[in-house]
């Protein structure tokens, strides 16, 4: 007995037919293509329009062109690179700033643009305040000033780059 039945909810007949045919999910991925269960044909069909979307999860294994501990740079096609942060809470620190600079270097030479975006739950929590706090507590003021300068220089590079750099929060 399923959850709906336990709560005295009626389950559609076609759901039982689907389960009887051995199909246990409304959605699946076959050969990298996302599919949905179609009631009329009683089979999976490709989700329409998905060729117009870029799903980073589909590119992670094959399209990485550069990576460090804080971010990855993917070729997303059409001469465009994508920078995806993967630091804790997608915070911005030295590694993510290095990735932004590296992606701009590559794009200005061999590509047409850069997108900074991800498909994580949170786009970015902002600056790595833990790192900033530790520098302040340790009284590493020169290093703190260098970190702030690196951030500012990188943001100016994003703004004035020779190629478009788009930040795409969600």
Protein language model features and the residues they cover:
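N-terminal glycine-rich phosphate-binding loop for ADP-containing cofactors
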Residues: 1-121, 129-163, 169-170
């Amino acid at each position: 007995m399923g959850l709906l039945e336990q709560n005295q909810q009626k389950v559609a007949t076609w759901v039982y037919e689907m389960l009887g045919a051995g199909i246990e999910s409304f959605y699946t991925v076959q050969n990298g293509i996302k599919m949905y269960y179609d009631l009329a044909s009683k089979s999976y069909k490709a989700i329409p329009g998905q060729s117009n979307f870029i799903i980073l999860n589909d590119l992670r294994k094959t399209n990485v062109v550069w990576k460090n501990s804080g971010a990855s740079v993917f070729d997303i096609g059409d001469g465009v690179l994508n920078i995806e942060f993967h630091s804790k809470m997608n915070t911005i620190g030295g590694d993510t700033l290095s990735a932004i600079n590296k992606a701009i270097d590559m794009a200005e030479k061999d590509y047409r643009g850069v997108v900074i975006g991800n498909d994580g739950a949170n786009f970015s929590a902002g600056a790595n305040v833990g790192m900033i706090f530790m520098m302040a507590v340790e009284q590493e003021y020169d290093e703190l000033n260098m970190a702030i300068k690196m951030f500012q220089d990188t943001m100016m590079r994003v703004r004035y780059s020779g190629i478009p750099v788009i930040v795409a929060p969600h």
